[in-house]
Each structure stands twice: as C-alpha cells, then as structure tokens.
Amino acid sequence: MEELSIQWIRDRLDSDRYRVSRHADDERVADNLTLSEIRQALLTGRILEHYADTGRGRSCLVVGFTNEGKPIHVVCGVRADHLILVTVYIPKPPKFRSPYERGDRA
C-alpha cells in the first residue's frame, strides 16, 4: 500500500471526509488549539515522517503552521478512506528542537 500524501490529506479535509480521534481532541484542548488552526496547519503543511503500519494502518506526521505562525504537529491515519487525526500537539523541547527536527529522547 502506498504512503499517505499531503494531497490525499488535503482532499479529505476539503471534502469533509475526516474524523478527529478522542485522543487528538483531548490533546487539542490541552494545547489550546482550535480545529480551524489544525485545518490551517494541514492545508499549508508538509509530511515530516511516514510511520510503518503496526496494525492500525498507514500514518504520517504533518508539520504545519497557523496563520499566526504557531507550529502544529498532526499525526494522520486512514480508516475506510477517511482521514483520521490521531493526535495533535505543539512541538516543543525536549522532544523537538524545532518544528522540523526531533530533539533528545528522554
């Protein structure tokens, strides 16, 4: 099966074929992110990492920015041709040196 593409992700957003997992919604609230900001990040972002299918399907990490320049990471997956937002967060040290670079693993 082919890797996810940013165009596939954007197509699902544009056609309202996406779901937000409970975990992603909890993390969104914890980081004070709106669904609109997450959408902005996905529509302007790029795929940073692809993850192997470990039994839950294909997934990838997208990095994008809000209109105000706030970085957001979104782990995206697939279920029945729908985009699943698995988790969302603001990348910060020590896990990330920058929005594009992993930091030291603690």
Regions from the PLM with identified roles:
Residues 1-106:
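Ribonuclease/tRNase effector modules and their secretory precursors
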